[in-house]
Amino acid sequence: MHNSPLYAAIDLGSNSFHMLVVREVAGALRTVTKVKRKVRLAAGLDPEFRLSRAAMERGWDCLRLFSEQLQDIPSDNIRVVGTATLRLATNVDEFLSEAERVLNHSIEIISGEEEAKTIYEGVSWTSAGEGNRLVIDIGGASTELVIGEHSEAKLLNSLHMGCVTWLNNHFGDGELSEARFQQAIAAAKTVLEKVAEDYRALGWRTCVGASGTVQALQEIMLAQGKSERVTLPKLQELMGQAIACGRLDRLQLEGLAAERLTVFPSGLAILIAIFETLNIESMTLAGGALREGLIYGLLGNNHDCDARDRTADSLISRYQLDKEHAERVRDTAVEAFNQLQPAWRLSKRYGRPILRYAALLHEIGLCIEYKKAPQHAAYIIDNIDMPGFTPAQKKLLSALLFNQRDEFKLDTLEKQGAVTGRQAIRLARILRIALILCMRRTQGTVPSFTLQAEEESLTLTLPKGWMDEHYLRASELRLEVERQQKIGWPTRVQEA
């Protein structure tokens, strides 16, 4: 089997150094290696912005680890960049001289504007969204704010505040109090006010976060049984939980990983300031950021389609799915969704896209075997990289595939976090009916149909005489009616 070439991106961040190694497979990126080491470079800056010898040593030690992985990758396929702390350091040349020797590769110190632009590039490739999108990336020593649409960044700024610098400035002695948080929030608002009006004037439809702070928040939300969308009340609730712990060395929040503890309060304070200053309603986690932007820059790919569409197309190709049949199921499921949306108040923004992808990928489990194909499909989705899909969207997709036939497994639908459990169940009911109507797998064999609903009651109307002429699908529909009625959902099939 011919392997495509490897590509590597290294981000010398203010808090951590990251290395991402990928290869392109079936039109999508497959992660080969991902390494992160906490270097705390920003903590080594003195008042004159000189990097301490100890901080530089931590950086060089990390790069020695990375250098081994780079030996077998063509130099043209590697990009290494330094960000905020290295932009600030007055003795950066001393650090770079040894760092480039260790890596055997040149290192670029990119401007704040280029960093923001590259972050947006990574987000646009790995996260779905229509209309203007606000991207927030809270780094160790800088915070990038970008508004863009599709692949075009329209407004961008790199601000001099980050989770490491705010930790040192406002939580340096480890005290977690209301006063300390308010002090940190107020300081962040002072920085934000210089640019806030431009962002409010341009506006956005969706907001995504591309930093470790937002990753930590989403992990906490899901661990605590909340939806994945970050809101100001949720942030304020977490601030209250942190204050109740009293000190940084006693900080314990359900779902917060140990390696994120130290900089979590400072990142949280900055994010609260951003939410309050820009009047943000909600935010989700981006699929990628700076490193992914560097990789896509190396590849030179275009931005002609939605990130989730690219992922679905790649999976269809990789697992050799019947694309024509998958698209027929998708069209049938979407038609059913559109008919039921007003009565069931289904989410066009959050529910319909995932139903589409469930229809397109419903046969992915067949690559293992038929009998337990729904379980296999769910397992694959749970354990594969899917650029463009948030963790909760992946869980919903997995739950729909798990429930595509046989008995319902309601717990998977109720615990996914992307939409309400009730909506997820209704999406599963739609998918199952669409799959039965498309069983012939041939163009022109899907009947015209009407679906009507009142609360959980569902009626499918087919052309007169259709059931007598299509024995197998009629039998499957009757079995499906029995399954749904057994749970307490009145369901019937009629002809007219």
Q: Language-model segments: which ranges?
A:
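Helical "lid/coupling" subdomains associated with nucleotide-phosphate turnover
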Residues: 4-7, 21-24, 40, 44-73, ...
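A structural signal for short, well-ordered beta-strand segments
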Residues: 35-39
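Short, non-transmembrane amphipathic alpha-helical segments
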Residues: 469-491
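Conserved beta-strand/loop subsegment of P-loop NTPase cores
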Residues: 77-80
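N-terminal basic/disordered segments at the start of proteins
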Residues: 2-30
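C-terminal amphipathic alpha-helical interaction region
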Residues: 414-415, 445, 491-496
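Beta-strand initiation motifs
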Residues: 27-32, 152-154
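Active-site-adjacent helix-turn-beta-strand microarchitecture at beta-sheet edges
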Residues: 141-142
